Structure formats: structure tokens, C-alpha cells
Amino acid sequence: MRKAIIAGNWKMNKTVDEAVKVVEELKPLVKDATCDVVVCPTFVCLDAVKKATAGSNIKVAAQNMHFEESGAFTGEVAPGMLEAMGIEYVVLGHSERREYFNETDEAINKKVKAAFAHNITPIVCCGETLEQRESGVTNNFIACQIKVDIAGLTKEQAEKVVIAYEPIWAIGTGKTATKEQANETILAIRNVVVEMYGKEVADKVRIQYGGSVKPNTITEQMAMSDIDGALVGGASLKAEDFSGIVNY
């Protein structure tokens, strides 16, 4: 059985004080959670949030990182810096990074490998546009992403990857894929992992759904065969809302 993982991507929200306040409110609400609980604050909040989660069951993720160890990359953060802070996860290849910062699958693959080199678990995002969904090319498009994003890993690394399926048309729009659509696409993603690394590895890979996840939609999504969690956006900014999802 794969253990569910629910992560809250705060995006570019929350000052340090606000971030710590949310975590302090969240801790008692999710202390009995049966899934892995992860929060993804901005870089400036990582240290304070990491300290605030000490002794709790809440893990901390960065929202991005560079693939190089150090150097003249102004504004970037190296994987070793995150490792030194005790950061457990990193979100890579989010559609907003791909769209606004022109991130390529090749760069994402370098980041995935760098994350593993520094004992950080990557949460690798993939997903299609509405145009691609309506044209019937969703599975082909996502397969192309995944085949590059997680290429060249050992089987031990591959089985630890978390994949987040986020239909771009459902992010922040209030629209959400039906539980059947989400499960069908996630099953297709798992089959790509089977092709790449074999069934034994694919059966261990946790695949989340993301895209306007709310407390009132999570239960039916988590009941599906291949959905192993959620990457939550706006609904993770309030402790009460996020705990309602975590405690599905």
C-alpha cells in the first residue's frame, strides 16, 4: 500500500510571521493524520517554518531549486543549501515555473537528479492545457513530460519520486477534473513509469492530483484506485481548510 501524501503549495504568499502562524494552527489539527503532510512555503519562510514544524508530523518542501551546486546564478538557491536546512521535499516543474520562467523538461530532469544527490525527495509536476485535453492528446503530452523529467534514475530513486498531476486548466480556476478523469490520467502516468522502470517500481510511486482541490472534493478523489494524495494550492493557505483536506 502506498502511503498518501498531501502537500500544500503556498506559492508566493505569506510573510515569515504569517507562515509560522499557519503552521502553529495546523500542528494540532493534523497531528493524527494518516497521510504524509507537507507544506511548501517561499524560500524566505523555509527556515522559520522548518523550526516551527520541529517535533511535529509536518514535513517541509521548497517550491523550486537550481540544479547546480553553487556559482554565479543570481537569485537562485542550490540543493545543498536546502539539504543543510533539513528540507525534505522540493516541488519541481510546476506549470507556473514552466509557463512564466520557461523551465524545460531537460532542466527539470537535472533538478530531480540534484535533489536525490542531496537526499531531497522531488515532487515532479506534470499536466496538460485545456486545448490539449479537448484535442485528446493529454496522455501523449504528459508521457513526453514524464519520460524526460524522471529519466536516468536508479530504481531506488525512481520509486521515491512523487509525481503531481495538475491539469493546467484546473489550477486556480475553480474547475476540477472529475475523479474519473484524474484517476484515468494518473493511471496513464503510472503506466509510463512501468515502461521506464518496471511494474514493481511503478507500484511504489506516489502520484498526487492537483488543481482546485478543496475539502469537499478530496474524499471522493482519494477513494480512487490510483490517486495517492493531493498538491493543494489556495486551500492550503488556511490551517482549517488544509486540515480538512489532510484529514479526509
From Swiss-Prot:
Recorded GO MF terms: triose-phosphate isomerase activity
Cytoplasm found in the keyword field: yes
This protein's record includes keyword Isomerase: yes
Matches recorded under InterPro entries: Aldolase_TIM (IPR013785), TIM_sf (IPR035990), TrioseP_Isoase_bac/euk (IPR022896), Triosephosphate_isomerase (IPR000652), Triosephosphate_isomerase_AS (IPR020861)
Superkingdom of source: Bacteria
Major location (coarse): cytoplasm
S-S bridge residues: none
GO terms under biological process: gluconeogenesis; glyceraldehyde-3-phosphate biosynthetic process; glycerol catabolic process; glycolytic process
Active site residues of this protein: 94, 166
EC number assigned by the record: 5.3.1.1
Top-rank EC class of the record's enzyme: isomerase
UniProt xrefs under CDD domains: TIM (cd00311)
Keywords noted in UniProt: Cytoplasm, Gluconeogenesis, Glycolysis, Isomerase
Record-level GO cellular component terms: cytosol
Compartment(s) of residence: Cytoplasm
Signal peptide segment: none
Reaction(s) catalysed (UniProt annotation): D-glyceraldehyde 3-phosphate = dihydroxyacetone phosphate
Pathway: Carbohydrate biosynthesis; gluconeogenesis; Carbohydrate degradation; glycolysis; D-glyceraldehyde 3-phosphate from glycerone phosphate: step 1/1
Binding, substrate: 9-11, 172, 212, 233-234
UniProt-listed PANTHER family: TRIOSEPHOSPHATE ISOMERASE
Entry's family note: Belongs to the triosephosphate isomerase family.
Known function: Involved in the gluconeogenesis. Catalyzes stereospecifically the conversion of dihydroxyacetone phosphate (DHAP) to D-glyceraldehyde-3-phosphate (G3P).
Quaternary assembly: Homodimer.
UniProt name for this protein: Triosephosphate isomerase
Organism: Clostridium botulinum (strain Eklund 17B / Type B)
Protein encoded by which gene: tpiA
